[in-house]
């Protein structure tokens, strides 16, 4: 249960980081 929430949080952070990278590449 706890590790599932942790994975969810990590996935969210990774998703946001990926979105930021894509936005940076597109904006460059």
Curated annotation (Swiss-Prot):
Compartments, as annotated in UniProt: Secreted
Main location: secreted
Role this protein plays: Antimicrobial peptide, active against the Gram-positive bacterium S.aureus, and the Gram-negative bacteria E.coli and P.aeruginosa. Has hemolytic activity at 612 uM.
GO biological process, one term: killing of cells of another organism
Expression sites by tissue: Expressed by the skin glands.
Matches recorded under InterPro entries: Dermaseptin_dom
Name the record gives this protein: Dermaseptin-6
One cellular-component annotation, GO: extracellular region
Assigned keywords, A-Z: Amphibian defense peptide, Antibiotic, Antimicrobial, Cytolysis, Hemolysis, Secreted
Similarity remark: Belongs to the frog skin active peptide (FSAP) family. Dermaseptin subfamily.
Record carries keyword Secreted: yes
Keyword Hydrolase among UniProt keywords: no
């Amino acid at each position: 249960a706890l590790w599932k929430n942790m994975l969810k949080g990590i996935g969210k952070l990774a998703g946001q980081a990926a979105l930021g990278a894509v936005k940076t590449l597109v904006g460059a």
